[in-house]
């Protein structure tokens, strides 16, 4: 395979991570996602198209960005009417000396990603680590994902995938067979509430988890736990029972809600419903873990 031919849209490569799998890892964040979770911590990853983050506190109003912009957008990218004109070319990012603007998406070849990974091989080998594919939603770019995963597999590295589960299993099967671990989200067990909060129902997601469980894949189900949304005892219990029924080695990770992505919403000119979401307290989280255990499912943490 020519690793310089297949290209993908990447949000970032996060190096030396100790989350989302065993050992020291590089996490490859793919652009694009079919879900639109209202609490999403990575709103820049919802689209494959490049968008510009505008950090207003760094802007000095020098006008360099406007001078190179093909649409003559002013310094304040989030001023009324300006965002709509932006084509995401990134010329303003290059021109800005104050780093007040950032691209959200970078196009990379498989070979370019591998070059980064090869620099970190000693850390992967010594720690039992590897590569984790995340996003956005990594399965939104199936050709690039498979080409990269096959190359990493050929290097003998551990591979994990963090996914919403909203994909065509038939199209992704060959790629999934290369994975050592699958992190699969269940945002909510109620179909209508899942659609209300993410934009899609959960039918395909649950179907895929059940099918991959029947294949005896190594799966950890994750719940982004948000009080008032899906952190109630009934939803956690229903999720644990589903996991117990369909996954041979049932494990479930409760990921407490955080608002780390709030600044990104502002930098993209978007509103953020922070007041609508609440992080579970330690006492609430302990109670939910006990419910998971009572259903015969192991609570785990990769954080």
Residue ranges and their predicted role:
Residues 1-62, 66:
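Flexible, acidic/Gly-rich N-terminal and inter-domain linker regions that tether
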Residues 1-22, 225-303:
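Auxiliary Fe-S-binding modules of radical SAM enzymes
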Residues 9-11, 76-77, 162-166:
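Short gly/ser/thr-rich secondary-structure transition/capping motifs
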Residues 38-45, 64-84, 91-107:
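Iron-sulfur cluster-binding cysteine motifs and their immediate structural context
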Residues 53-58, 78-85, 105-118:
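Short cysteine/histidine-rich metal-coordination sites, predominantly Zn2+-binding motifs
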Residues 54, 195-201, 269-277:
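Short glycine-enriched, charge-decorated loop/helix-capping segments at active-site entrances
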Residues 111-260, 266-267:
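Conserved AdoMet/S-adenosylmethionine-binding subsite of the radical SAM
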């Amino acid at each position: 395979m020519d690793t310089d031919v297949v290209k993908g849209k990447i949000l970032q490569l996060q190096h030396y991570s100790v989350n989302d799998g065993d050992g020291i890892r590089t996490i490859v964040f793919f652009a694009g996602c079919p879900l639109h979770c209202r609490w999403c911590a990575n709103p820049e990853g919802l689209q494959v198209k490049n968008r510009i983050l505008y950090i207003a506190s760094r802007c000095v109003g020098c006008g360099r960005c406007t001078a190179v912009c093909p649409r003559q957008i002013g310094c304040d990218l989030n001023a009324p009417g300006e965002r709509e004109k932006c084509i995401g070319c990134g010329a303003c990012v290059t021109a800005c000396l104050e780093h007040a603007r950032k691209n959200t998406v970078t196009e990379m070849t498989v070979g370019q990603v591998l070059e980064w990974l090869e620099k970190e091989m000693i850390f992967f080998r010594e720690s039992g680590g590897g590569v984790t594919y995340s996003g956005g939603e990594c399965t939104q770019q199936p050709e690039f994902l498979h080409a990269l995963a096959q190359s990493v597999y050929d290097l003998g590295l551990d591979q994990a995938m963090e996914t919403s589960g909203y994909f065509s299993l038939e199209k992704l099967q060959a790629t999934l067979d290369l994975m050592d671990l699958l992190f699969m989200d269940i945002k909510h067990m109620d179909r209508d509430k899942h659609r209300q909060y993410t934009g899609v129902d959960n039918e395909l997601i649950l179907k895929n988890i059940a099918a991959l469980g029947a294949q005896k894949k190594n799966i950890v189900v994750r719940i982004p736990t948000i009080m008032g949304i899906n952190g109630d005892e009934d939803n956690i219990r229903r999720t644990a029972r589903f996991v117990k029924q369909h996954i041979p080695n049932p494990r479930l990770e409760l990921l407490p809600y955080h608002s780390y992505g709030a600044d990104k919403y502002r930098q993209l000119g978007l509103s953020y419903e922070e007041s609508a979401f609440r992080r579970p307290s330690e006492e609430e989280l302990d109670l939910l873990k006990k419910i998971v255990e009572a259903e015969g499912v192991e609570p785990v943490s990769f954080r």
